[in-house]
């Protein structure tokens, strides 16, 4: 796979940047590859929120390392939210509950919802994107691998959630016109 830049990624002579929430899982890894293919300069943010499956962060780091060895320049930062999110109730982060196994059903998987997780992650990557705008004067996409198949279980994977979040971010920040959500796996359901 070769990295390339198209005219649509150019912003006054510079490359449009992307900041993405990168778990290292299947959805975010496929999104990272898509962004590479589309020619974006990418900053990946992985979150340690006290999740029981620390393999995600290990996979994220391994995936980035592999891509760097292939010649791709990708920034990768790991943000530690364990203290803040330790007060939340979810089977993914508390020892008081077990993570359900087996078929991916709403009733069974509801315990895996981490309250407000995608809003928190989006806020952090949005703030980071605003910092890039201020330093570099470029447009930035903030990307998440959320997809429409998750919305039945995870309310923060719904198109209307991201539309509302985008409106709130634009109201609450200067330079927000330079930032857009990039959500290709729910893109057909939403226009932000």
Regions found by a protein language model. Give the residues of each.
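ATP-dependent adenylation/nucleotidyltransferase module used to activate substrates
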Residues: 2-190
């Amino acid at each position: 796979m070769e990295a390339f830049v198209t005219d649509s990624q150019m912003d006054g002579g510079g490359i449009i940047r992307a900041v993405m929430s990168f778990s290292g899982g299947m959805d975010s890894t496929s999104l990272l590859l898509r962004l590479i293919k589309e020619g974006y300069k990418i900053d990946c943010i992985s979150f340690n929120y006290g999740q029981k499956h620390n393999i995600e962060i290990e996979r994220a780091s391994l995936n980035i390392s592999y891509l760097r060895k292939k010649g791709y320049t990708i920034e990768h930062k790991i943000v530690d939210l364990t203290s803040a999110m330790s007060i939340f109730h979810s089977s993914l982060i508390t020892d008081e509950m077990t993570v359900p196994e087996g078929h991916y059903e709403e009733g069974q998987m509801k315990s895996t919802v981490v309250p407000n997780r995608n809003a928190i992650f989006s806020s952090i990557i949005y703030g980071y994107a605003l910092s890039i705008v201020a330093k570099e004067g470029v447009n930035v996409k903030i990307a998440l691998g959320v997809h429409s198949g998750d919305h039945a279980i995870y309310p923060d994977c719904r198109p209307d959630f991201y539309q509302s979040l985008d409106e709130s971010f634009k109201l609450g920040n200067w330079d927000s016109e330079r930032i857009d959500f990039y959500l290709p796996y729910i893109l057909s359901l939403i226009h932000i």
